[in-house]
Amino acid sequence: MSESGKTVTRVDLCEAVYQKVGLSRTESAAFVELVLKEITDCLEKGETVKLSSFGSFMVRKKGERIGRNPKTGTEVPISPRRVMVFKPSAILKQRINNGAAAKTNGDVAKVAAG
């Protein structure tokens, strides 16, 4: 969850495309769905999706391993599986950290002024 407590949904993304691009609401929703479907299809095939200045979505294979049942302590085999990971770009990391620093500095300035 974000610091503001807001979670951005598909509907929010569609509305942003509608407001900023000028497509109709129907076209905006179709556009967002198409982009998400394309990303999903690529990941299903095991392809990496790299979005410049944003980050990369990748599928990694996890091998079989032994886990433990936390209640009983007995060992349980965990089947091999594929997991999706997201690696943010350096630009995105910097923007997130600078944004957090700016908010923190703004709060400090408000407290000092108050």
Swiss-Prot record:
User: By its UniProt entry, which InterPro entries does this protein fall under?
Assistant: Hist_DNA-bd, Histone-like_DNA-bd_CS, IHF-like_DNA-bd_dom_sf, IHF_alpha
Entry keywords, A to Z: DNA recombination, DNA-binding, Transcription, Transcription regulation, Translation regulation
Question: PROSITE patterns recorded for this chain?
Answer: HISTONE_LIKE (PS00045)
Origin: domain of life: Bacteria
By its UniProt entry, which Gene3D superfamilies does this protein fall under? IHF-like DNA-binding proteins
**Would I find DNA-binding among this entry's keywords?**
yes
Q: Which GO terms describe its biological process?
A: DNA recombination; positive regulation of metabolic process; regulation of DNA-templated transcription; regulation of translation
Q: Name one Pfam family in it.
A: Bac_DNA_binding
Cite the SUPFAM superfamilies for this sequence.
IHF-like DNA-binding proteins (SSF47729)
As one GO molecular function, the record gives: DNA binding
Which cellular component terms (GO) are annotated to the entry? cytosol
The reply on keyword Transferase is: no
Function statement: This protein is one of the two subunits of integration host factor, a specific DNA-binding protein that functions in genetic recombination as well as in transcriptional and translational control.
List the PANTHER family hit by this protein, alphabetically. Answer: DNA-BINDING PROTEIN HU, INTEGRATION HOST FACTOR SUBUNIT ALPHA
How does this polypeptide assemble, per the annotation? Heterodimer of an alpha and a beta chain.
Stated family: Belongs to the bacterial histone-like protein family.
Q: What is this protein called?
A: Integration host factor subunit alpha
Give the organism the record lists: Afipia carboxidovorans (strain ATCC 49405 / DSM 1227 / KCTC 32145 / OM5) (Oligotropha carboxidovorans)
Q: Which gene encodes it?
A: ihfA
